[in-house]
Amino acid sequence: MNRSRRTFLAGAGAALSSGVLAASGSRATAETTARPATNDAPRGLTFATIRRGQELSLAIKTERGLLDVRTAESVFHAKAPTAIDEVIGRGGGAALQALLAKALASARKDLFLDEAKADFGPCVTNPEKIVCVGLNYRKHAAETNSAVPTQPILFNKYNTALNGHRGIIKVSEEAAKQFDYEVELVIVMGRTARNVSEKDALSHVFGYCTGNDFTARDLQRVSSQWMLGKALDGSAPIGPYLVTADQVPDPNRLKIECRVNGEVRQSSNTADMVFGCPSLISYISRYFTLKPGDIIFTGTPEGVISGYPKDRQVWLKAGDQLTSTLEGLGELRFSLS
C-alpha cells in the first residue's frame, strides 16, 4: 500500500474517536432488517428509468416488459408519478399499483417496452448526495494489505458520475490509465435520516440497486484524498432496477459478482461487509442529514485489479465490457470507450 493511501487511512481513523460506533449490532451479520414505513410508499415494485428523447421517465418492471408509466398515465387519464424523483420520499404507491393493474389488464402492447431494447438511465436520477464507503469488505481489506477499519471510511461522488445500464464510460478521454472495477450494493434512502439508530435505520430505506464504483487508481493515489480517482464522469453506473426495500429480506446477505468480458473477477456475499447497511446509515446520519433519494455505495468485495500482484495487474481499457450483479437486484452492464 503506497504512502498516500496509508496517510489517508490513518487520518480517517484518527479523526474520530474509537468509541463512535455502538458495540452491539455494528457488524453486518448481527443487524436488524426493519422495513420502511413511509406513508403510501410503493411496495412490491421494481422501478427503472428510461430515456424518452431528452426526457427521463419512470418505468415498472413486469412480466410483459417495462411499463412506460408516462404513456400509461396518458392512455388511462390517470394521475401517477412519472419520474423516480416523484416517488422516492413522496409516495404514490397506490396510484402506481392502480395504473399497473389497468395496464396489465389491457391488451395494449404499446404500453410496454422490451427490456432488451430500452434505453436506460440511472435508476436514481437526482441524488443530493452520493456517499461511498471504502474498505468495507474484510477480504478486500486483506487483499490491499490494509487494516480492517474500526469505523466506516467515507468519500463521495457527484451527480456527473451517474450512469445507467448499458451506459458507456469514456476512458479514452481521461488523463488516467489505471482503471478498475468495484461492484457494490447501493442503498437508496426513502426518508430523511438524522441521528437514527441502527434499529430504525432500514425503515428509512426506499430500496436497493446494483452499482459499480468505477475507479482510476492512479488518480486515487495522487494524494491522501481519493476524490480524483472516484469522481470521473460516468463512474457511478447504477441499475438497471431499483427494487423496493420490502422485496429484500436481508441486504446483508446477498450474492455479489463482477465480470469483465465474461470472466468472473469478483464473487462474494454482502455478509463479508465490515459494517452492514444499518450501521452505515446510522453512522452517516450522525454527522450529516441523509435525504430521500440520497444513495450510499456500500463498498466492494475482493477481486479488484489493484489487489492483484503487480505483475498481474492488467488495467481496464476501451472496449472492455463489464457486468455487475447483486442477488435479486438485477444485472448492470456497461462498457468502456
Feature roles, as predicted:
Residues 35-39, 48, 120-122, 142-145, ...:
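A generic local secondary-structure boundary/capping motif
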Residues 60-65, 189-191, 261-262, 326-328:
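Short acidic-glycine loop/turn motifs at beta-strand connectors
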Residues 135, 157-159, 166, 173, ...:
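Short, structured patches in soluble enzyme cores that scaffold and shape functional sites
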Residues 61, 146-165, 181, 318-327:
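Structural signature of FAD isoalloxazine-binding scaffolds in flavoprotein oxidoreductases
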Residues 36, 170, 217-337:
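Catalytic-pocket segment enriched in acidic/His residues
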Residues 125, 132, 180-182, 291, ...:
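Residue-level recognition of short, solvent-exposed, well-ordered loop/turn junctions
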Residues 1-2, 7-28:
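N-terminal export signals
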Residues 5, 12, 29-152, 321-323:
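N-terminal non-catalytic cap/leader segment that marks the start of a structured domain
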